[in-house]
Amino acid sequence: MLAPRGATFLLLHLALQPWLGAGAQATPQVFDLLPSASQRLNPSVLQPILTDPTLNELYVISTFKLQSKSSATIFGLYSSADHSKYFEFTVMGRLNKAILRYLKNDGRIHLVVFNNLQLADGRRHRLLLRLTNLHRGAGSVELFLDCTRVDSIHNLPRAFSGLAQSPEAVELRTFQRKAHDSLEELKLVVRGSLIQVASLQDCFLQQSEPLATTNTGDFNRQFLGQMSQLNQLLGEVKDLLRQQVKETSFLRNTIAECQACGPLSFQSPTPNTLMPVVPAASPTPPVRRCDSNPCFRGVRCTDTRDGFQCGPCPEGYTGNGIVCSDVDECRYHPCYPGVRCVNLAPGFRCDACPVGFTGPMMQGVGISFAKTNKQVCTDIDECRNGACVLNSICINTLGSYRCGPCKPGYIGDQMRGCKMERNCRDPELNPCSVNAQCIEERQGDVTCVCGVGWAGDGYICGKDVDIDSYPDEELPCSARNCKKDNCKYVPNSGQEDADRDGIGDACDDDADGDGILNEQDNCVLTHNVDQRNSDKDIFGDACDNCRNVLNNDQKDTDGDGKGDACDDDMDGDGIKNILDNCQKVPNSDQEDRDGDGVGDACDSCPEVSNPNQSDVDNDLVGDSCDTNQDSDGDGHQDSTDNCPTVINSAQLDTDKDGIGDECDDDDDNDGIPDLVPPGPDNCRLVPNPAQEDSNSDGVGDICEADFDQDQVIDRIDVCPENAEVTLTDFRAYQTVVLDPEGDAQIDPNWVVLNQGMEIVQTMNSDPGLAVGYTAFNGVDFEGTFHVNTQTDDDYAGFIFGYQDSSSFYVVMWKQTEQTYWQATPFRAVAEPGIQLKAVKSKTGPGEHLRNSLWHTGDTSDQVRLLWKDSRNVGWKDKVSYRWFLQHRPQVGYIRVRFYEGSELVADSGVTIDTTMRGGRLGVFCFSQENIIWSNLKYRCNDTIPEDFQEFQTQNFDRLDK
């Protein structure tokens, strides 16, 4: 028997030689992550390990137990500064899932989902997570559970590439223990092979497919073949050793009973009793006793007068007590159908119930036990555990489940979820308040917006006298716009309240609460009882950004709290003003292509020398390079227009190829044409050559909820198809003075509030504009107009389609009839009421344009009156009005409406004019102080309104007659 056994171990040694050599080349480095471990890894060591460029593979091993259906984050790496995630592994017991979250190099979180895992079932589990290709190639993740690989995912973004470089920036957090939960082991392993790491959990991996190789050279095809042979060989060795043990035991007992081996022989009158047989001519032999251990191990031995007597074989064995052989209980099928039965010596064990079933562990000894105790596996009803999204149909099947469509009354799918069906056209499905407008969004979602003169969340709306989107009284809802307006009769969409006394600054006589009324206070919004003012400008030291330099404009270009008048680096680009070729525009590179001493970043003619930067027409193009040749009339001269013959005032060029989207056949340059085959592109602005569309709704997966991928969802994006415009913002604006010369020149004083959504003009000034820098094609523009004084009765309004100071549309409102006090160059008479004018001035800013704007009517080569409110009613002091403008320059459509409270008081109807084919937005004032433009909103919109078609039909019918 020694020769076969020796040969077996010799063969085993030879087979293990390659494996032993490989193991010697890559010894695993193990770091314990548990708080209680004496060798716990210091968090400061984590960052150098994980960002080591030579490390292309790592392992995380853990042993834990979670209560049934519970969820827990087993381990994670986080930013010490803002607690954002770098790496996190979470078990979601109720969903039978595990999720790996990690930070990609673009700063976004990537999710890897492992499905159909029973990790939270009250049992102890061993988990091994293997990450490969950390620094080279496409990443991959393998998950091993209880020594079996359960999932592998490849072609993933690399992990740890976005990890902070500072060692102190990484924080390790481990399992937060709850009652009946335990975390026995949590280790980080680097280097070494998968087999070596698995052995740390007493796992000898059995896999149905070759292990994934890595780029480190740990394994090769030859080694994998050897490992496969080694698996087979070890199984054979195990069976051989078990058989040899049985044979050795049998031989020992046979020799003990053999008559030829000595003077004694035994015969057994009964199966369990040995009696000596004495030959006739021989002397009486000695009687054998129990002290010679004649019985099988564990069998009771009893000495009798005639010899020894062995008891029955132990449970799980069969024989005469001297020789006992293991019983194979698996032949009696004690395990659930399909579950592997493992025969033990003695006894048997059943593997865990199949995926989709649950049941207790099954283990026993003996034929009787195997016959009378069968493993019970009960189907798991995944539909009770939230396997499908809420409010969807879930169909439970034996060992599995299937998710169906949304339940009746709900819409959506398994990707987006099932939400209660809402429909603006069906009164029973319309969730909005009776005082709200119901809007159907691109994805079929419904949004509720309180109507004019009402405020709230859209589902609940309350009265809003000043039309600033805040209700007069508190509403029973949680949205910001449900809070009570802190200035009931003065629009203040930002609800600013410097002294936090519950009264908004817009209506608080002492806004800073220092006991000094605003009119006498040199710091209206800053508490300063002493009113100290070192430089004698109009701002006290407490709020003056240049305490020792007179600067009434308080201009602070770089927003560093130091006014431009006393800041030696106004734009904060690190270059002193005296050396900076763009003092108010950051340009650390100081590039100056035309060598005129003005940097390209602020040069109105970057390729033509113009050191004086003269721009007479205020179109942001210097006179030296301004041709005023604009073939399509969109406000951009042909030499700089990215679509010279196609109207596109916005100049959007998504793929930055120099061709505007309006004339580009492939806006995102992904090889899929926008409109023609093999298009149309289901994500026109985001590259997606594969055109994935999981729910077949015609919108690609990558741009499903954010069409332009500007990180602002379409529902709140003011321009969902323009990544450069996301929110209404007039904080950056251009001032345009329309009468720049005069003896009593007073320019407007503009104050911007509420993050660019509210503008206030405080001076009784000459005509002027505050114009935003964003240009639009089609646009909807709305806002609240309010004159917060009882002084004066002149013009206020807004502009659109601004191309230069001689070309724009203006909507202006005069309170009373009045003749302009300067009759030169002509007598101008203003009538009360709302007027819509097209300005196309040959002279530009000056007395001709000034008087033409004042005059109600057409003026040659200056202004055309497109529409006037026939009511001839002027605006009222301290009353709020809401305007809505629609402009579609591609067809010349213009319509403007005015509301007083919730009542429509003026409507221009459809007006057609193509003088300006798009442009910028802004506000207008002429000799009127204390004007508020509040709750401003603009939205890109090229959709032609339905009433345009009706207008065309009526006009054609008129022509036919």
UniProtKB/Swiss-Prot annotation:
Residues 286-325, 326-363, 379-419, 420-462 form the EGF-like domain. This is Thrombospondin-4. Residues 581-671 are annotated as: Disordered. It comes from Bos taurus (Bovine). GO terms for cellular component: collagen-containing extracellular matrix; endoplasmic reticulum; extracellular space; sarcoplasmic reticulum. Disulfide bonds join C290-C301, C295-C310, C313-C324, C330-C341, C335-C350, C353-C377, C383-C394, C388-C403, C406-C418, C424-C438, C432-C448, C450-C461, C477-C482, C487-C507, C523-C543, C546-C566, C582-C602, C605-C625, C643-C663, C683-C703, C719-C940. Coiled coil: none annotated. One of its GO terms (biological process) is regulation of tissue remodeling. The gene is THBS4. GO terms for molecular function: calcium ion binding; growth factor activity. InterPro entries: ConA-like_dom_sf, EGF-like_Ca-bd_dom, EGF-like_dom, EGF_Ca-bd_CS, Thrombospondin_3-like_rpt, Thrombospondin_3_rpt, Thrombospondin_C, TSP/COMP_coiled-coil. Keywords: Calcium, Cell adhesion, Disulfide bond, EGF-like domain, Endoplasmic reticulum, Extracellular matrix, Glycoprotein, Growth factor, Mitogen, Repeat, Sarcoplasmic reticulum, Secreted, Signal, Tissue remodeling, Unfolded protein response. A motif (Cell attachment site) lies at residues 562-564. Residues 640-652 have a biased composition (Polar residues). Belongs to the thrombospondin family. TSP type-3 repeats lie at residues 463-495, 496-531, 532-554, 555-590, 591-613, 614-651, 652-691, 692-727. Residues 24-192 form the Laminin G-like domain. Adhesive glycoprotein that mediates cell-to-cell and cell-to-matrix interactions and is involved in various processes including cellular proliferation, migration, adhesion and attachment, inflammatory response to CNS injury, regulation of vascular inflammation and adaptive responses of the heart to pressure overload and in myocardial function and remodeling. Binds to structural extracellular matrix (ECM) proteins and modulates the ECM in response to tissue damage, contributing to cardioprotective and adaptive ECM remodeling. Residues 1-23 form the signal peptide. PANTHER family: THROMBOSPONDIN (PTHR10199), THROMBOSPONDIN-4 (PTHR10199:SF92). Residues 731-945 form the TSP C-terminal domain. It is found in: Endoplasmic reticulum; Sarcoplasmic reticulum; Secreted; Secreted, Extracellular space. Residues 660-671 have a biased composition (Acidic residues).
